[in-house]
């Protein structure tokens, strides 16, 4: 059996934030969520998250994840002290324990699976992940013999000048036989520069300790400040965009595009520069997104084009033309072959197939049928100062420019509303509606001097 322990008790002082460091977002998920997800391939029997700073907030943020256990570390006295908190909850556990840091979010599941496999295949007491860094400053150094068996681990601040020339660093990721670790943890001392309990000192009490180098040292990047968080985001984005381009998605100027790894894309999607895809969005084949668009938590059906527009929490049907400068939001549903154009906002509305609203309109809390044409400047006046009200427009109806529909109101099918009208009453099918003051010409209206 395998258990996982995630160290997530620290404050993260260098983040300059009240938010616990492990809860800072990285591409749509918190740092610690990404660490938890990286354990998927080893299928752990138990996942223990060690919390401390603002523990209740961390627990609440992770409450949606199943089978997660929390262990509190009331004082933060080092990594060894954090793992000592497992002695009671894991007192009856038999198997191996993987130790991960909650602020190292880029580890691939395959890397953790390889670590566990190496550990078990070689019957090690402990196996630690290492990396060869071009600049290892700040990391503990790992010293091994010719068989990758560890002879010594020295924290950076405790290294002498000769030891600091070693580029093999400790990534802070371990797999231990729990029985060996549990026996060694009470023996830790604070005899070091930081006066803390170092988990690495457990190695002194293990007979066989092996190091395994990670293939890509970027995986073990830790997050201690905003600059490192930004750098990790760039690494994550490179991975995501490479994956989708290899799957048949075209991304122009990828350095200007961001895609959350919760987004799903189908082949032959084209993503133009300065476009951002977030949340649980699904983009179907043949769509063109951008330039300059934001899609968030939305479904975009096949062969739809969205230019310089924002779509959030909504659905857009096939072969639609959206933008430029359109805002669709609030669980809106746009049908097939619709055109929604310049400076149009659609909020919490259902738009039927083949409906057009080309410019300068607000459609809120409305249901529009098929083949409706919304003239420039049409407004659904849905708010009375207290409540929102519904507007219904039937199939094939048309609103003239600068029309106002005062909700609640129902406009029937095949209705034409004259330009400049303010409609306050329901309208039957197949009517022409004129609701505006008559034009009047008054000659000689100026006073004679």
From Swiss-Prot:
Cell compartments where the protein resides: Cytoplasm
Single GO BP term: lipid A biosynthetic process
InterPro entries named among the record's database cross-references: Bifunctional_GlmU, GlmU-like, GlmU_C_LbH, Hexapep, MobA-like_NTP_Trfase, Nucleotide-diphossugar_trans, Trimer_LpxA-like_sf
Region: Linker, residue numbers: 227-247
Molecular-function annotations in GO: glucosamine-1-phosphate N-acetyltransferase activity; magnesium ion binding; structural constituent of carboxysome shell; UDP-N-acetylglucosamine diphosphorylase activity
Entry annotated with the keyword Cell cycle: no
Active site, per annotation: 359
Region of interest called N-acetyltransferase, as start-end residue ranges on this chain: 248-449
The protein's enzyme class: transferase
Span list, region Pyrophosphorylase: 1-226
Cofactor binding summary note: Binds 1 Mg(2+) ion per subunit.
Catalytic activity line of the entry: alpha-D-glucosamine 1-phosphate + acetyl-CoA = N-acetyl-alpha-D-glucosamine 1-phosphate + CoA + H(+); N-acetyl-alpha-D-glucosamine 1-phosphate + UTP + H(+) = UDP-N-acetyl-alpha-D-glucosamine + diphosphate
Annotated acetyl-CoA binding sites: 376, 382-383, 419, 436
Pfam family, one: Hexapep
Recorded superkingdom: Bacteria
Cellular component GO terms held in the UniProt record: carboxysome; cytoplasm; membrane
Keyword Iron-sulfur (UniProt): no
Co-factor requirement: Mg(2+)
Enzyme Commission identifier(s): 2.7.7.23, 2.3.1.157
Annotated keywords: Acyltransferase, Cell shape, Cell wall biogenesis/degradation, Cytoplasm, Magnesium, Metal-binding, Multifunctional enzyme, Nucleotidyltransferase, Peptidoglycan synthesis, Repeat, Transferase
Free-text function comment from the UniProt entry: Catalyzes the last two sequential reactions in the de novo biosynthetic pathway for UDP-N-acetylglucosamine (UDP-GlcNAc). The C-terminal domain catalyzes the transfer of acetyl group from acetyl coenzyme A to glucosamine-1-phosphate (GlcN-1-P) to produce N-acetylglucosamine-1-phosphate (GlcNAc-1-P), which is converted into UDP-GlcNAc by the transfer of uridine 5-monophosphate (from uridine 5-triphosphate), a reaction catalyzed by the N-terminal domain.
Known partners and oligomeric status: Homotrimer.
Protein family per UniProt: In the N-terminal section; belongs to the N-acetylglucosamine-1-phosphate uridyltransferase family. In the C-terminal section; belongs to the transferase hexapeptide repeat family.
Protein name: Bifunctional protein GlmU
Gene: glmU
């Amino acid at each position: 059996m395998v258990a996982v322990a995630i160290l997530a008790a620290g404050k993260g002082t260098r983040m300059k934030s009240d938010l616990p460091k492990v809860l800072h977002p990285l591409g749509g998920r918190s740092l610690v969520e990404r660490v938890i997800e990286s354990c998927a391939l080893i299928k752990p029997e138990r996942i223990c998250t060690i919390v401390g700073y603002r523990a209740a907030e961390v627990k609440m943020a992770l409450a949606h994840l199943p089978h997660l256990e929390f262990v509190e570390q009331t004082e933060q006295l080092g990594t060894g002290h954090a793992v000592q908190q497992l002695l009671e909850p894991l007192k009856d556990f038999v198997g191996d324990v993987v130790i991960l840091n909650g602020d190292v979010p880029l580890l691939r599941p395959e890397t953790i699976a390889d670590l566990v496999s190496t550990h078990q295949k070689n019957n090690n007491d402990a196996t630690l992940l290492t990396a060869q860094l071009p600049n290892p400053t700040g990391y503990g150094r790992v010293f091994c013999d010719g068989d990758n068996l560890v002879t010594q681990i020295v924290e950076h601040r405790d290294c002498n000048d000769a030891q600091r020339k070693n580029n093999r660093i400790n990534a802070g990721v371990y797999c231990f036989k729990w029985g060996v670790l549990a026996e060694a943890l009470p023996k830790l001392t604070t005899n070091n520069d930081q006066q803390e309990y170092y988990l690495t000192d457990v190695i002194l009490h293990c007979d066989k300790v092996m190091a395994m180098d990670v293939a890509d040292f970027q995986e073990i990047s830790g997050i201690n400040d905003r600059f490192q968080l930004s750098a990790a985001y760039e690494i994550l984005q490179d991975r995501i965009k490479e994956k989708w381009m290899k799957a048949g998605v075209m991304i122009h100027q990828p350095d200007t595009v961001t895609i959350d790894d919760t987004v799903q894309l189908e082949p032959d999607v084209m993503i133009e520069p300065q476009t951002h895809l977030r949340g649980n969005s699904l983009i179907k084949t043949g769509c063109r997104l951008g330039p300059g668009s934001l899609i968030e938590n939305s479904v975009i059906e096949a062969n739809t084009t969205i230019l310089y527009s924002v779509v959030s929490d909504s659905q857009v049907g096939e072969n639609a033309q959206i933008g430029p400068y359109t805002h669709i939001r609030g669980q809106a549903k746009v049908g097939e072959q619709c055109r929604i154009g310049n400076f149009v906002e659609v909020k919490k509305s259902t738009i039927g197939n083949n409906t057009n609203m080309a410019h300068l309109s607000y459609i809120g809390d409305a249901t529009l049928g098929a083949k409706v044409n919304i003239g420039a400047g049409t407004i659904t006046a849905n708010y009375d100062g207290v409540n929102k009200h519904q507007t219904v427009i039937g199939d094939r109806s048309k609103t003239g420019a600068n029309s106002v529909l005062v909700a609640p109101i129902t406009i029937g099918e095949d209705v034409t509303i004259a330009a400049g009208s303010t409609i306050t009453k329901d309208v039957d099918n197949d009517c022409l509606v004129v609701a505006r003051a008559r034009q009047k010409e008054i000659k000689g209206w100026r006073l004679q001097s």
